[in-house]
């Protein structure tokens, strides 16, 4: 027998990003950023991806959008920073749709795409402390990279974040191989 409350939960689909999604994605980014108050400077919390950057990601097939009733509620934006690796540049879920597996499905879509594209790994940088950041990604098989493991491309990501005002001591760079191998077990 079905529970009435479970029948009211929204259904989510992960779709390829489209131009008509762009205005909603900035709203999602700002709403999700509010959860990081106290972890990031106010200036960073007000940043959003530019329309040009999102259009470029759409054209490259590197933007995944979670929709509910055809409305965007979250998104993942990946980049190809270096040969053989995708970098999860942005993951945001509107707080009204948090803790329902939307972020997990978006990360899964990026990792599935990377594996299907014969890429070796997915990397990302995130906050160390909030449970929906590094601990969340660790639960999905990502591991923290030590400083000596950072590639030149990942060092540039860290340097860019530092210039934006993010404290590198509060951040981690993480890695997940796309195949079960000793490199990411």
Feature roles, as predicted:
Residues 44, 48, 133, 156-157:
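Short Asp/Glu-rich motifs
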């Amino acid at each position: 027998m079905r529970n009435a409350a479970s029948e009211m939960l929204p259904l989510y689909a992960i779709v390829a990003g489209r131009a008509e999604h762009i205005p909603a994605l900035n709203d999602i980014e700002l709403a999700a950023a509010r959860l990081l108050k106290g972890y990031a400077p106010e200036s960073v919390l007000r940043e959003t991806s530019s329309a040009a950057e999102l259009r470029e990601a759409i054209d490259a097939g590197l933007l995944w959008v979670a929709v509910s009733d055809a409305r965007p509620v979250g998104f993942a934006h990946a980049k190809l920073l270096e040969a053989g690796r995708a970098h999860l540049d942005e993951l945001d879920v509107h707080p009204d749709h948090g803790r329902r597996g939307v972020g997990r499905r978006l990360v899964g879509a990026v990792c599935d795409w990377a594996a299907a594209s014969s890429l070796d790994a997915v990397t990302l940088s995130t906050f160390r402390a909030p449970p929906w950041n590094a601990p969340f990604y660790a639960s999905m098989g990502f591991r923290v990279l030590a400083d000596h493991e950072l590639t030149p491309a990942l060092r540039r990501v860290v340097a860019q974040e530092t210039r934006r005002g993010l404290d590198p001591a509060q951040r981690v760079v993480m890695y997940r191989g796309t195949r079960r191998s000793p490199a990411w077990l």
